[in-house]
Structure formats: structure tokens, C-alpha cells
């Protein structure tokens, strides 16, 4: 007689996942992604050397908070030793919550300095009402931070510009200054005295915003220039957002193109010797007429018409 096995009980529905656990996992993945991108940028451009004293410029915005957080995490497992000091420039803007950053940095245990310099009054006095303050404010802020770096033995100055900033700057230079230029991930200042690094060069702004929200950084809004409407950078930013919406990945493609420059396919005579094209080996330069002769011939042809 064949035994009849009892039918198995139907499987109970699995317990629903705790949304808090899912959120924590997503935040963990995002944090690891940002760490990987920051580490890659540091490696690709040689941003940090053994013994560096890095001044982390902290404005109170999402970008600089994220940059400091990433550098602190990487510092614990970095292949070379380096130190960090967070520096905020108190520009004496009205209603600026001066207590926020010291309280946050004290709780974090990070060495920091607050540099007080009333650039707000200067900008407000010099820039006409209704005009953009960003350019002058940026120059004054940069001068104050460079002066601090000079007197405190800083070897690298870390700024919180991200990938979207770099691409937007490229288009601003293209549209308004007729030049192909963006923000270098690493550069030497114009006076040659300082090395500036941008550890967030590979990180998208949307990911920074999500990370800052997850970490609940005490964000301080900029009431000086951040509130001005119709700024060129905002307009370019909206254009890039629209492009990314219409064709996801387009901004990433543009960013990668900045690292694949081909001078022979452009028209900058200082970067590529177009006059040498057509020579073979060590042949001497062609005995071509002076370029001015072509202009003279062109004018003569025009006159004869």
C-alpha cells in the first residue's frame, strides 16, 4: 500500500522588509560609491602626498560637508599619512549662524579654524544693486583662504567642486569667454604658492545631495550670492539637467571628454604645429610666404572685384 504524504502547508508570505534597513543599505552603498570616486580622483591626479597638511575649505554647504566627511573616512585607511584642518571663512553676512560650524566640528573632533573677514561689506559697497556678486566675492574669499594657507603651513587646499560644477564651468567659458577651459581637479594657484585639489571631481551633485540628506549635515544657505536669480551658472545648470533628463549619461560623457583632448582636431596653433604638417622626417620648414602676404593678396583680390 502506497503511503499518501500530506500536502505541504503553503509557504507563509515573507515578512516585509523593514524600510529603515533598506534605507540604511542604500545609504551605505552610496557612501561606498562616493568613497570610491573620491579615492579614484585622488589617485588619478596625485592629489595627496605623504605628510600633506590639507586645508578643507568648509562653507556650510552640502558639497564641502561631503568632502570633509569623505576625506575623514579615507584618512583612516589611506596608504599615506596626512592631516586635515577644516577652515571656514566668516564673511560677516547678515544672519549668518556663526555657532553651527564650530558646534558641528567640535562634536566631530576635527581641528578647525574660523577666519573672520568682512568681505560682505566690501562686496555690498562695490557691486551695484541687482548685479551678480559671485565674481568679486569669490576673489576676496580666495585671497583670504590663500593667506591662511600661507601662514599655517598648509600644503594642499581642498575645494568642494563636483563633476557638475566642472562641466558647467566648461560651458560658461565656452559661451561667455570663447575658450575651452573648465576646472582642473588639481592645479597650482596663479601666484604659484598653493596647490588646489578638488577631491569631488568625479562625484555627481545629485549623489552629494542624497548623501548630505542621509547624513543630516547642518546646511547653512548662502544669503549673499546663492539667493540671486538668473545667474549664468544657474542657467547652465538647468541646461545640463534638461540634457541629462532627455538623454541620461550625457553629462558624464561631457565630463569624460574633458580628459580626452585632441589638439590636432582643434584649432589652437599654440598646442599643435599645423605649419609642420606635410613635412617628412627632419626636413627643414617649407619656404612659405609670410602669413601677412596672404592677407595682402586677399585684400588685392577684393579691391580688383
Swiss-Prot record:
Biased composition (Low complexity): 282-293
InterPro entries assigned to the protein according to its UniProt record, in alphabetical order: Rossmann-like_a/b/a_fold, TilS/TtcA_N, tRNA_Cyd_32_2_STrfase, tRNA_thiolation_TtcA_Ctu1
Chain ranges passing through the membrane: none
The EC number(s) this enzyme carries: 2.8.1.-
A single BP term in Gene Ontology: tRNA thio-modification
Pathway: tRNA modification
Cofactor(s) recorded in Swiss-Prot or TrEMBL: Mg(2+); [4Fe-4S] cluster
GO cellular component: cytoplasm
Keyword terms, alphabetized: 4Fe-4S, ATP-binding, Cytoplasm, Iron, Iron-sulfur, Magnesium, Metal-binding, Nucleotide-binding, RNA-binding, Transferase, tRNA processing, tRNA-binding
Region (Disordered): 1-20, 282-305
Residues that, per the record, bind [4Fe-4S] cluster: 134, 137, 225
Main location per the UniProt record: cytoplasm
GO molecular function, one term: magnesium ion binding
Reaction equations catalysed: cytidine(32) in tRNA + S-sulfanyl-L-cysteinyl-[cysteine desulfurase] + AH2 + ATP = 2-thiocytidine(32) in tRNA + L-cysteinyl-[cysteine desulfurase] + A + AMP + diphosphate + H(+)
Family: Belongs to the TtcA family.
Function: Catalyzes the ATP-dependent 2-thiolation of cytidine in position 32 of tRNA, to form 2-thiocytidine (s(2)C32). The sulfur atoms are provided by the cysteine/cysteine desulfurase (IscS) system.
Misc. comment: The thiolation reaction likely consists of two steps: a first activation step by ATP to form an adenylated intermediate of the target base of tRNA, and a second nucleophilic substitution step of the sulfur (S) atom supplied by the hydrosulfide attached to the Fe-S cluster.
The name this protein goes by in its record: tRNA-cytidine(32) 2-sulfurtransferase
The organism of origin for this protein: Xanthomonas oryzae pv. oryzae (strain PXO99A)
Lineage: Bacteria, Pseudomonadati, Pseudomonadota, Gammaproteobacteria, Lysobacterales
Amino acid at each position: 500500500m502506497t503511503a499518501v504524504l500530506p500536502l505541504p502547508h503553503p509557504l507563509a508570505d515573507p515578512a516585509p522588509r523593514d524600510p529603515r534597513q533598506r534605507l540604511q543599505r542604500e545609504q551605505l552603498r552610496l557612501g561606498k560609491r562616493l568613497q570610491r570616486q573620491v579615492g579614484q580622483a585622488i589617485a588619478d591626479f596625485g592629489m595627496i602626498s605623504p605628510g600633506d597638511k590639507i586645508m578643507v575649505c568648509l562653507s556650510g554647504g552640502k558639497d564641502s560637508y561631503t568632502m570633509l566627511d569623505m576625506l575623514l573616512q579615507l584618512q583612516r585607511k589611506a596608504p599615506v599619512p596626512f592631516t586635515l584642518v577644516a577652515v571656514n571663512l566668516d564673511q560677516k553676512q547678515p544672519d549668518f549662524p556663526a555657532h553651527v560650524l564650530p558646534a558641528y566640528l567640535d562634536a566631530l573632533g576635527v581641528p578647525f579654524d574660523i577666519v573672520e573677514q568682512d568681505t560682505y561689506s566690501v562686496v555690498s559697497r562695490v557691486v551695484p544693486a541687482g548685479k551678480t556678486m559671485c565674481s568679486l566675492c569669490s576673489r576676496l574669499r580666495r585671497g583670504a583662504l590663500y593667506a591662511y594657507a600661507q601662514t599655517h603651513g598648509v600644503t594642499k587646499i581642498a575645494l568642494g567642486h563636483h563633476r557638475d560644477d566642472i562641466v558647467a564651468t566648461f560651458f560658461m567659458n565656452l559661451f561667455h569667454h570663447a575658450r575651452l577651459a573648465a576646472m582642473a581637479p588639481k592645479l597650482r594657484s596663479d601666484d604659484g604658492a598653493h596647490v588646489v585639489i578638488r577631491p569631488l571631481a568625479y562625484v555627481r551633485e545629485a549623489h552629494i545631495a542624497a548623501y548630505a540628506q542621509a547624513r543630516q549635515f547642518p546646511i547653512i544657505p548662502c544669503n549673499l550670492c546663492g539667493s540671486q536669480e538668473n545667474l549664468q551658472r544657474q542657467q547652465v545648470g538647468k541646461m545640463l539637467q534638461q540634457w541629462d533628463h532627455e538623454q541620461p549619461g550625457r553629462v558624464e560623457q561631457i565630463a569624460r571628454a574633458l580628459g580626452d583632448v585632441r589638439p590636432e582636431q582643434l584649432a589652437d596653433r599654440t598646442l599643435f604645429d599645423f605649419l609642420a604638417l606635410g613635412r617628412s622626417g627632419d626636413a627643414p620648414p617649407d619656404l612659405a610666404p609670410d602669413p601677412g602676404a596672404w592677407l595682402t593678396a586677399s585684400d588685392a583680390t577684393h579691391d580688383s572685384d
